[in-house]
Amino acid sequence: MFMINVLSLIIPILLAVAFLTLVERKVLGYMQLRKGPNVVGPYGLLQPIADAVKLFTKEPLRPLTSSMLMFIMAPILALTLALTMWIPLPMPYPLINMNLGVLFMLAMSSLAVYSILWSGWASNSKYALIGALRAVAQTISYEVTLAIILLSVLLMNGSFTLAMLITTQEYMWLIIPAWPLAMMWFISTLAETNRAPFDLTEGESELVSGFDVEYAAGPFALFFLAEYANIIMMNILTTILFFGAFHSPYMPELYTINFTVKTLLLTTTFLWIRASYPRFRYDQLMHLLWKNFLPLTLALCMWHVSLPIITASIPPQT
């Protein structure tokens, strides 16, 4: 694999993330009947560039009591993992075509928990630590349902490769037979990426701004980039799993356009939800998962396991 392939994946991701921050501020602005950023460049289009310059030219301060190595490693690890998770995504062709792409993505997203934990612990601040513990509890809790939902969808798909989902959904989106799974998946992705209404890690009133409270300038920007890269990545995964775009090898551009539009709509839904809903209480968040989602997803997983076995003897319908 050549360096150019990696760069042609990473640079567009970072650009998309930069402009997603602008889109979010604009969308939230218009939803609150104001303009949003509109000073830097035409219609505020150069705002992300100005932000990047400002953040990366500031001095990266760190608390005297912090653990230096971990404090610096955490944001680097967060961004590295966020970018690594894009490797097996078929858009329509993945960077590396893995047999167990889904498993790889789950493993990477589990590793991301460590960056949160380290940043909270290494900051040596009580607020950062509480925020980190909340974030870790939330992330690993919702990963359980994400994994089970993924398994159910892949049982319908019949293969662990993500590219196979494109073939599976040639005639019908998987959201139609699996809509309860899709709804739970979407809510779980919101919780997994620490977005409103599940942004308890950064409850301003009680925790200042969560696990990254002690970070400034560059390292803070890395956390920010990682968070938004994860948001786009989750929406891309939702598109692949439930809204499969039609892919013809003769016109791959059509797939890309189709795929991008769906991902953008889902990302806008994320922002819309942020503008509309108040934050959950922590016990409600955990009740929703362990008492509602987990039993439901387990039941649906059993259903999806038994479905191919039940229908195995039926002659093909097409």
Swiss-Prot record:
Keyword list, A-Z: Electron transport, Membrane, Mitochondrion, Mitochondrion inner membrane, NAD, Respiratory chain, Translocase, Transmembrane, Transmembrane helix, Transport, Ubiquinone
Membrane topology annotation: Multi-pass membrane protein
GO biological process, one term: mitochondrial electron transport, NADH to ubiquinone
Gene Ontology cellular component list: mitochondrial inner membrane; respiratory chain complex I
EC id: 7.1.1.2
Transmembrane regions listed in the UniProt entry: 2-22, 69-89, 100-120, 146-166, 171-191, 223-243, 253-273, 294-314
PROSITE patterns listed in its UniProt record: COMPLEX1_ND1_1, COMPLEX1_ND1_2
GO molecular function, one term: NADH dehydrogenase (ubiquinone) activity
Reactions catalysed, as given in the entry: a ubiquinone + NADH + 5 H(+)(in) = a ubiquinol + NAD(+) + 4 H(+)(out)
Compartmental location: Mitochondrion inner membrane
Superkingdom of this protein's organism: Eukaryota
Similarity section: Belongs to the complex I subunit 1 family.
Role noted for this protein: Core subunit of the mitochondrial membrane respiratory chain NADH dehydrogenase (Complex I) which catalyzes electron transfer from NADH through the respiratory chain, using ubiquinone as an electron acceptor. Essential for the catalytic activity and assembly of complex I.
Subunit details: Core subunit of respiratory chain NADH dehydrogenase (Complex I) which is composed of 45 different subunits.
HAMAP family per UniProt: NDH1_NuoH
This protein's name: NADH-ubiquinone oxidoreductase chain 1
Native species: Felis catus
